[in-house]
């Protein structure tokens, strides 16, 4: 880092501290800003100046070494949300930190508090990201209060030629920390709708955590002469976060609408379906999603005008669906690149200049 950058760092931290002091502390979602690359390094700001509610700040002060894992968990959740919805009408768009006005808003804007299917997915994927990141840190030996899962040691099935060993991911600690950091007590809220939405968010947080636990897999290593695999050492490991994202996207597609008049426990909105139990890993929502086809400045919805689409696809990225029946524009993009490169002795590379034309389709 050059001298000018070093001199500018204190000013940058002070600016972020001032901006973040404007963030509402009582919300669950502002911690998600930590996953944005342009946010900077939260460890340099300190717990007091981070966009956390009072409970989260207290936990941060007691366990400051967890900040890198919290930041990585937020980054994982944001990245996977954008990946899963990159071809959808709602593409998991996040606010930017280019202005104070945007930085003071929830990262996902309207969707974070709307009580829709999109809200459900955001809470689930972010909670899952936190579990995944913290558990990875435990397994890597980066923390003193957790490590590998020791409950499986010395177990297995000798008669079948395998035993538990290695380092199983301690997902239970990751889930415990995620609950401690994210889940607000319902008793602290006022208003019937607020209580229903908070209960919904808490359920979806847990659904995200359950997804990580449910998709745990078993890896094994063979031992024996010449790779005979006479004995296997096995351990439990978390699935890739991409696989967890696919699982939660499927849950999003099959999410359950609940009644906004829930009293003691959440119920399905449709009375004829109430005999079917709600499972821990189901995603729940209260309100139907808004129209993402057209711009709605009040809700911060950009619409799909100008989005690139696939003319030949019948899926969500196809021009017919993504453009909501409005049609699309086609323009030709010229690409110039180096090609057919050859090494000439001695000592340079000679390339041809190749041009290609590509049709690009964008929604009207």
From Swiss-Prot:
Q: Which Pfam families does UniProt cross-reference here?
A: wnt
SMART domains reported for this sequence: WNT1 (SM00097)
Role, per record: Ligand for members of the frizzled family of seven transmembrane receptors. Probable developmental protein. May be a signaling molecule which affects the development of discrete regions of tissues. Is likely to signal over only few cell diameters.
Q: Family assignment?
A: Belongs to the Wnt family.
This protein is called Protein Wnt-16
One MF term in the entry's GO annotations: signaling receptor binding
> Lipid attachment points, O-palmitoleoyl serine kind?
226
GO cellular component labels: cytoplasm; extracellular space
């Amino acid at each position: 880092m050059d001298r000018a950058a070093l001199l500018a760092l204190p000013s940058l931290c002070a600016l972020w501290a001032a901006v973040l002091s404007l963030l509402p502390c009582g919300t669950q979602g502002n911690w998600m800003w930590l996953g944005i690359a342009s946010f900077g390094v939260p460890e340099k700001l300190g717990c007091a100046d981070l966009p956390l509610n009072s409970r989260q700040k207290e936990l941060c002060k007691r366990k400051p070494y967890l900040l890198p894992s919290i930041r990585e968990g937020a980054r994982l959740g944001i990245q996977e949300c954008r990946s899963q919805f990159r071809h959808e009408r709602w593409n998991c768009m996040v606010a930017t930190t280019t202005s104070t006005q945007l930085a003071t808003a929830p990262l996902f804007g309207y969707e974070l508090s709307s009580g829709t299917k999109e809200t459900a997915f955001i809470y689930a994927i972010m909670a899952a990201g936190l579990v995944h990141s913290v558990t990875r840190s435990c397994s890597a030996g980066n923390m003193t209060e957790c490590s590998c899962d020791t409950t499986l040691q010395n177990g297995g099935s000798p008669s079948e030629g395998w035993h538990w060993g290695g380092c199983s991911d301690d997902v239970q600690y990751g889930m415990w920390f995620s609950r401690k950091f994210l889940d607000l007590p319902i008793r602290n809220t006022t208003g019937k709708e607020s209580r229903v939405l908070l209960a919904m968010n808490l359920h979806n947080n847990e659904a995200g955590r359950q997804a990580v636990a449910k998709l745990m897999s078993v890896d094994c290593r063979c031992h024996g002469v010449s790779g005979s695999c006479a004995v296997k050492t096995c351990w439990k490991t978390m699935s890739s976060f991409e696989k967890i994202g696919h699982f939660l996207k499927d849950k999003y597609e099959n999410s359950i609408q609940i009644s906004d008049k829930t009293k003691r426990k959440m119920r399905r909105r449709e009375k004829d379906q109430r005999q079917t139990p709600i499972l821990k890993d189901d995603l729940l929502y209260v309100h139907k999603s808004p129209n993402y086809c057209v711009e709605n400045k009040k809700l911060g919805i950009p619409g799909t005008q100008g989005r690139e689409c696939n003319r030949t696809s019948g899926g969500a990225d196809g021009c017919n669906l993504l453009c909501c029946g409005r049609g699309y524009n086609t323009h030709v993009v010229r690409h110039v690149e180096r090609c057919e490169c050859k090494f000439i002795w001695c000592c340079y590379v000679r390339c041809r200049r190749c041009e290609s034309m590509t049709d690009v389709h964008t929604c009207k």
